[in-house]
Curated annotation (Swiss-Prot):
Role of this protein: One of two assembly initiator proteins, it binds directly to the 5'-end of the 23S rRNA, where it nucleates assembly of the 50S subunit. One of the proteins that surrounds the polypeptide exit tunnel on the outside of the subunit.
GO BP terms: translation
Protein name, per record: Large ribosomal subunit protein uL24
Organism annotation: Clostridium acetobutylicum (strain ATCC 824 / DSM 792 / JCM 1419 / IAM 19013 / LMG 5710 / NBRC 13948 / NRRL B-527 / VKM B-1787 / 2291 / W)
Keyword RNA-binding: yes
Self-association and partners: Part of the 50S ribosomal subunit.
Molecular function terms, GO-annotated: rRNA binding; structural constituent of ribosome
Pfam families: KOW, ribosomal_L24
Length: 106
């Protein structure tokens, strides 16, 4: 797939479709080859873990599963909404991402 992903690690995002629609979370990891992102406390699945030497007690373990990057939008903390971004070059030459609704930089 190898598309460019519009969110980065530690961004605040909101899920726009699926069973976790409307949830806001922080991006933990990004996988551009698969086009997925891992978001804290979103798309939590239960894994049946067998007991082993590291984890003597097995059982049910809850962990986040990856979600398609097309299902998330960047969340602006200033205007408190999901927003698209534009890119802008500052006077000193650095590139920044800017909220299209309020103009806040990320």
């Amino acid at each position: 797939m190898a598309n460019k992903i519009h969110v980065r690690k530690q961004d605040s995002v909101v899920v726009i479709s699926g069973k976790d629609r409307g949830k806001i979370g922080e991006v933990l990891a990004v996988n551009p080859k698969k086009g997925t992102v891992l978001i804290k406390d979103v798309n939590v699945v239960v894994k049946h873990q067998k007991a082993n030497k590291e984890n003597m007690q097995g059982g049910l373990i809850k962990k986040e599963a990856p979600i398609n990057s097309a299902k998330v939008m960047l969340y602006c903390t200033k205007c408190k909404t999901a927003t698209r971004i534009s890119k802008k070059v500052l006077d000193d030459g650095t590139k920044v991402r800017v909220c299209k609704k309020c103009g806040e930089t990320f």
